[in-house]
Each structure stands twice: as structure tokens, then as C-alpha cells.
Amino acid sequence: MPTESSTIILASKSPFRRRLMEDAGLSIMPEAPRVDERALEAPLEGTGVTPDEVALVLAEAKATEVSARYPDVWVIGGDQTLSLDDLIFHKPKDMDGARRHLLALSGKTHFLNSAIVLARGGEAVWTHVSIARMTMRPVKPAFIGRYLARVGEKALESVGAYQIEGEGIQLFESIEGDYFTVVGVPLLPLLAKLRELKAIDG
């Protein structure tokens, strides 16, 4: 449980996001947001809200909910959506879902929309969205099966059923965008803003 003296709270229980920020030198305390993401997202469907805007809505909801409980601490909230044409993908629930994701993405270009929000006193102070363009090579169903057998349930941890920092890189033909955007944490603009706010040493 974070305390009011924590340097920065991460509104997430993701060990990967926490490790990424700690490796960058941030003092992080995780706190799970009390947010129903699908309930927030459902009213946005069919309204013309773009996938990057959906990511921002969810990131802001996470950050401000936790910030309302810890108003004197900087809170980071993040979210990432994967969009293919007009579809927004969610994390696969099982290995069959992961297979369907990869088959749908095979040979096509999709986008990873990564939003990050800084909040304090229950209010969003700063928001940022970065977008990466991901082109997957045409992948045969048999290879997808072998790939999923090798990576196992790690495939269920990401919205695209792949981890670009691991064997998932073999699925791709080209990537346009910052590495940290691809993994869901636009770290460079976040660090720049934290330095500007004097929340970290700069």
C-alpha cells in the first residue's frame, strides 16, 4: 500500500511497466486503479471516438481515480489500445483468442496507441499519446501455432498477443515508432514532463 510520502505512484499492477520505470531511475509504488475499463469503453463505441482517444480516456480514469485517494502524490496512469481498421482489440482471454488475434493481424498494418497521464489532487495535469505503426509479415497458421506453443501464456499479457521485446519481434516486417510506445509506456515525454515539474532530478 503506497503512502503519502511515496515519490510517484503507478496506477497499475503491471510488473513490466513498474520495472521499466524503475530501470529508468524512478521511485515507483504500484496501486491498482478501481476502474472498470470495459464499462468506460462501452459508451464510446460508435461515437466517432478514435482508438487513441479511447486509450487516453482509460489512462486518465486510472490516474485520476488513484490520485483522488492519494492527492499529494504524483500519479502515473497509462493505457494502450490496438487498432486495425475500425476495430479495437482487447487482450485475448485464452490461447484460442490469441491465435485469432494473430491470424487477423497477419500481413496487415495495425496501430498501437499508447496514452500516459500525470495526475495530482484527483485531476489530470498532463496527458500524452504516442502512436506506433506496426506491419506484421504474412504468417502461416502453422507458424502461429508453434509460436504460441513456445511463448505460452505470455501471449495473453499483451493486447496483440505478442511481446515485441521477445520472440514476438519475429512476427513483424516493419515498425514505425518509438520502442517505448510499442511496449505501452511513452517514457521519453513522461520523463521530460516529470523533470519540468521537478518531480524527479533533472
From Swiss-Prot:
Keywords on record: Cytoplasm, Hydrolase, Nucleotide metabolism
Enzyme class, first EC level, given as a word: hydrolase
Site (Important for substrate specificity): F16, Q80, E165
Chief location of this protein within or outside the cell: cytoplasm
Catalytic reaction equation(s): N(7)-methyl-GTP + H2O = N(7)-methyl-GMP + diphosphate + H(+)
A cellular-component GO term for this protein: cytoplasm
Protein family per UniProt: Belongs to the Maf family. YceF subfamily.
Function: Nucleoside triphosphate pyrophosphatase that hydrolyzes 7-methyl-GTP (m(7)GTP). May have a dual role in cell division arrest and in preventing the incorporation of modified nucleotides into cellular nucleic acids.
Name recorded for this polypeptide: 7-methyl-GTP pyrophosphatase
Organism listed in the record: Chelativorans sp. (strain BNC1)
